A protein has these predicted regions:
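Short histidine/acidic/glycine/proline-rich micro-motifs that form metal-
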Residues: 9-14, 40-42, 67-68, 119
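Conserved strand-to-helix beginnings and helix N-cap segments that scaffold or border functional pockets
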Residues: 16-20, 48, 73-77, 106, ...
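N-terminal beta1-alpha1 ligand-phosphate binding loop
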Residues: 1-23, 27
Length: 147
């Protein structure tokens, strides 16, 4: 499976970069992962234009949004597993900037998910996402992973 994580903004702090690299390394056993950082724009609309330019028609797009569908770890694992079964090998997960995602991006998404109704920095959400992707693949493969 090819997974792209599109993120608005860069990870500046070394501790976030270290955590990201660790999960990227762990995920390399299960998928081809690409993380693309896009420049923060003056508005979600401009950021949305940049995001939409990077999407292909055959991408299965998952937007992270506070108003999205809440999933358990098992629920996310099932979604990812089903995408593979359905032959959808290109998955793009989108993390917006501090003002969220544009309506155009949310409209393009095949699925909108929420990790919480709380607000978190996008760097932290990226680590949460990578960890949950790793956990999902461990669940799919029936491998143990600490809880």
């Amino acid at each position: 499976m090819n997974i792209t994580v599109l993120c608005i903004g860069k990870m500046k702090e070394p501790y976030w970069r270290e955590a990201s690299k660790e999960y990227e390394k762990r995920l390399s056993k299960y998928c081809n992962l690409i993380i693309t950082e896009l420049k923060e724009g003056p508005s979600p609309l401009k950021e949305g234009e940049d995001i939409l330019k990077r999407l292909r028609e055959d991408d299965f797009v998952i937007a992270l949004d506070m108003k999205g569908q809440p999933l358990t770890s098992e629920g996310l694992a099932r979604r990812i597993e089903n995408l593979g079964i359905e032959g959808k090998s290109k998955v793009v997960l989108i993390i917006g900037g501090s003002d969220g995602l544009s309506q155009d991006v949310l409209g393009r998404a095949n699925l909108q998910i929420s990790f919480s109704t709380l607000t978190f920095p996008h760097q932290m959400i990226r680590i949460f996402l990578l960890e949950q992707l790793y956990r999902s693949f461990k669940i799919i493969k029936g491998e143990t992973y600490h809880k």
